[in-house]
Amino acid sequence: MATNAKPVYKRILLKLSGEALQGSEGFGIDASILDRMAQEIKELVELGIQVGVVIGGGNLFRGAGLAKAGMNRVVGDHMGMLATVMNGLAMRDALHRAYVNARLMSAIPLNGVCDNYSWAEAISLLRNNRVVILSAGTGNPFFTTDSAACLRGIEIEADVVLKATKVDGVFTADPAKDPSATMYDQLTYSEVLEKELKVMDLAAFTLARDHKLPIRVFNMNKPGALRRVVMGEKEGTLITE
């Protein structure tokens, strides 16, 4: 196993799913998981890594079901964006309690709650070792938080998007349904598309590919996995050119 004395990334974009925050409850935010994630992010900051974070909102709101029931998709997506802001507030609070300087930015203006998203301000904060939480997706309906992660990753000039999931990486098939599924250590963007592997939605994935932004998929539920990823150890699946 390769072990580096120094991190292999200087600036990362960490994509957390909303579901990752809910733990075994099935809904809402599990405070113990939130605090563990804050501690893992703190470790990265102490290593000198600049950290941007995008969080989904699926633990608080899922628009798909309501869309089927007749709700306007734009309204549902706006509600989903607000759910990501709520998760961002919780993460900012957890980081502050862990004595980590963190700033929450939103793609839709919410004066008095958090800062408006500014690309230049985000980069300035990162350079000053502040964790920047980027909420409300892209600010537009019809785009996922994976798209937001890739877009913000490109904007802040991140070295990589680290997509935290509930599985160890990208597999040949769904490991929950197929016990013979094996995990890929590395893939190219083309291989992911050819094999129709579920990494991200197509809009997000092609955005990353077109801008040569590497993606690493790993299991955030595995203690220490995030640190191992940034130290260049064998963890998860790396997707590059």
From Swiss-Prot:
Q: What are the UniProt keywords, alphabetically? A: Allosteric enzyme, ATP-binding, Cytoplasm, Kinase, Nucleotide-binding, Pyrimidine biosynthesis, Transferase
Function, in words: Catalyzes the reversible phosphorylation of UMP to UDP.
Q: Tell me what controls its activity.
A: Allosterically activated by GTP. Inhibited by UTP.
Q: Tell me where in or outside the cell this protein is found.
A: Cytoplasm
Q: Which gene encodes it?
A: pyrH
Q: Which reaction does it catalyse?
A: UMP + ATP = UDP + ADP
Q: Which domain of life is it from?
A: Bacteria
Q: What class of enzyme is it?
A: transferase
Q: Which GO terms describe its cellular component?
A: cytosol
Region annotation Involved in allosteric activation by GTP: where it falls in the sequence: 23-28
Would you kindly state one Gene Ontology biological process term found in this protein's UniProt entry? UDP biosynthetic process
Which positions bind UMP? G57, D77, T138, G139, N140, P141, F142, F143, T144, T145
**Where does the chain bind ATP?**
K15, L16, S17, G18, G58, R62, T165, F171, D174
Origin organism lineage: Bacteria, Pseudomonadati, Pseudomonadota, Gammaproteobacteria, Enterobacterales
A single GO molecular function, which one? ATP binding
- Protein name per UniProt: Uridylate kinase
* Functional pathway: Pyrimidine metabolism; CTP biosynthesis via de novo pathway; UDP from UMP (UMPK route): step 1/1
Which InterPro entries does this UniProt record tie to the protein?
Answer: AceGlu_kinase-like_sf, Asp/Glu/Uridylate_kinase, Uridylate_kinase, Uridylate_kinase_bac
